[in-house]
């Protein structure tokens, strides 16, 4: 998702070494952020001008089931790359999350105090704290509900909705009690580049403009697909999915890009504009796909 957008943005202007433990693209090499010695060797042989850490275990239920791996990937991995960035004296970009907040406020600025609820959020917050406290040249960017990668790579809410439609579902159940802001990966990658050019290190919220519920995202996506008369979306509470999605989630993950706005560095568009742009790839895919006949299903991200 985000890795592809960042690679496309930076490979057009610089030499990029992109790594992962899942080599699903020809431009990827292998590196495991949990293994300090291995990732140190991988990075130092390349002599980078900047290190961008996109490695994360983001499935909340997976993090609850495998808490050790969550901490090793999201916290220790962040530390390993941060130590290497200090050693090489290069800027370090760490991606944090709106999930680190407890949901007791309607919206959070860069200066609000986190209160993580889930193992995922706690491990990401731990990584964020280390980077902010120990890495000299750091950018910590807090993202919201990621959308990007299209039908092939998007593992988040928008593609979950689309996949249900492809499966022939005509009735979708979507929660209306979770609020936040989508984060379009294309704009997010542009934002990373803008910040690196600025050399204004620090912590930044970086999400799309506006606020919405999961339900509102689903309604807008269905409208953009031209399926308003074909798909029925039913509002449900989070309890509807309590067995499948059992990890604690804050009621509100809405972030405000206060610092980016104050410094004239905000490149993030309104969430509806981003969803419209992002939906083009799904519309193109649907033209070659068999869209639904009848069914009923439940959806949440």
What are these model-derived regions, one by one?
Residues 150-152, 178-187, 206-224, 277:
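Substrate-binding strand-loop-helix patch
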Residues 72, 76-80, 100-141, 145-147, ...:
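Catalytic helix-loop patch of NAD(P)-dependent Rossmann-fold dehydrogenases
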Residues 129-180, 186-187, 193:
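NAD(P)-dependent short-chain dehydrogenase/reductase
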Residues 3-4:
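N-terminal Rossmann-fold NAD(P) dinucleotide-binding loop
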Residues 261, 270-301:
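Amphipathic terminal alpha-helices
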């Amino acid at each position: 998702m985000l890795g592809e957008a960042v690679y496309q943005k930076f490979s057009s202007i610089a030499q990029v070494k992109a790594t992962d433990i899942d080599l699903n693209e020809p431009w990827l090499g292998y590196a495991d952020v949990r293994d300090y010695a291995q990732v140190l060797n991988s990075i130092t042989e390349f002599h980078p001008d900047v290190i961008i850490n996109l490695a994360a275990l983001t499935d909340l239920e997976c993090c609850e089931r495998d808490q050790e791996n969550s901490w090793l990937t999201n916290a220790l991995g962040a530390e390993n790359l941060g130590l290497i960035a200090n050693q090489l004296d290069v800027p370090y970009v760490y991606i944090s999350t709106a999930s680190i907040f407890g949901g007791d406020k309607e919206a959070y600025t860069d200066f609000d105090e986190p209160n993580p609820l889930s193992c995922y959020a706690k491990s990401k917050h731990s990584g964020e704290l280390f980077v902010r406290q120990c890495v000299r040249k750091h950018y910590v960017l807090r993202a919201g509900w990621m959308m990007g990668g299209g039908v092939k790579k998007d593992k988040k809410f928008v593609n979950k909705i689309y996949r249900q439609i492809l499966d022939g579902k005509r009735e979708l159940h979507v929660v209306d009690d979770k609020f936040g802001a989508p984060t379009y990966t294309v704009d997010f990658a542009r934002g990373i580049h803008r910040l690196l050019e600025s050399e204004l290190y620090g912590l930044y919220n970086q999400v799309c403009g506006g606020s919405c519920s999961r339900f509102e995202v689903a309604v807008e996506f269905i409208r953009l697909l031209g399926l308003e008369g074909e798909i029925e979306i039913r509002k449900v509470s989070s309890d509807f999915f309590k067995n499948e999605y059992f990890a604690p989630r804050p009621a509100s993950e809405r972030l405000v890009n206060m610092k980016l706005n104050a410094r004239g560095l905000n490149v993030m568009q309104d969430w509806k504009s981003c969803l419209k742009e992002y939906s083009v790839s799904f519309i193109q895919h649907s033209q070659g796909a068999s869209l639904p006949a009848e069914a009923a299903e439940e959806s949440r991200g």
